[in-house]
Curated annotation (Swiss-Prot):
This is Ras-related protein RABH1c. It comes from Arabidopsis thaliana (Mouse-ear cress). The keyword Ligase does not apply. The lineage of its organism: Eukaryota, Viridiplantae, Streptophyta, Embryophyta, Tracheophyta. GO terms for molecular function: GTP binding; GTPase activity. Belongs to the small GTPase superfamily. Rab family.
Length: 214
């Protein structure tokens, strides 16, 4: 009988201040939904996704952390054994951007600077009129810390798939990032770029939006 290869597991921890949209990014990716009713994460939430790549199957473990100060003491233990750290800020709130330095430094302190993939994510690009952080500032900070950078809008579904393509391409041993999810595993996810989805993502960031966006 042929041996069964073990399922590769990668732990992704989402970090950032309260209300920057960490949960909304995960919800958009997992269920292709956006919840307009904001409910802050209490402590740590966990979701898991099995994905097929062209050469193997992997399981992504998504850990959603609370941004409130009173939960900060819980976070280092979740960073410690993570494969990927996604540090999220709100492009319409400059202080959340400034605070990403602390989050990135927390990751470096717990994991070192070479043993973890870090992605800096500027979320809520749909709030065009309220933007306080430019794309170039995000790019510069990414270069400063030697981390990947991308902007997203969970509300408009802008660059959400691109974010996870970026992550998938950087995972150890992953040469291809055409992904699909088991039909019985929550929701079907296909991260292969198509002309329609690319156009949708390109247009998503241009749409203005008022009110709360995560």
């Amino acid at each position: 009988m042929a041996s069964v290869s073990p399922l590769a597991k990668f732990k992704l921890v989402f970090l950032g201040d309260q209300s920057v949209g960490k949960t909304s990014i995960i919800t958009r990716f997992m269920y292709d939904k956006f919840d307009t009713t904001y409910q802050p994460t209490i402590g740590i939430d966990f979701l898991s996704k099995t994905m097929y790549l062209e050469d193997r199957t992997v399981r992504l473990q998504l850990w959603d952390t609370a941004g409130q100060e009173r939960f900060r003491s819980l976070i280092p233990s979740y960073i410690r054994d993570s494969s990927v750290a996604i540090v999220v800020y709100d492009v319409s709130n400059r202080q959340t951007f400034l605070n990403t330095s602390k989050w990135i430094e927390d990751v470096h302190r717990e994991r070192g600077q070479s043993n973890v993939i870090i992605v800096l994510v500027g979320n809520k690009t749909d709030l065009v009129e309220k933007r306080q952080v430019s794309i170039s500032e995000g790019e510069d900070k990414g270069k400063e810390y030697g981390v990947m950078f991308i902007e997203t809008s969970a509300k408009e579904n802008f660059n959400i798939k691109a974010l996870f393509r970026k992550i998938a391409a950087a995972l150890p041993g992953v040469d291809s990032y055409s992904l699909a999810t088991k039909s019985d595993d929550m929701v079907d996810v296909n991260l292969k770029t198509t002309s329609n989805s690319s156009q949708g993502e390109q247009q998503g960031g241009a749409g203005g939006g008022g009110g709360c966006s995560c």
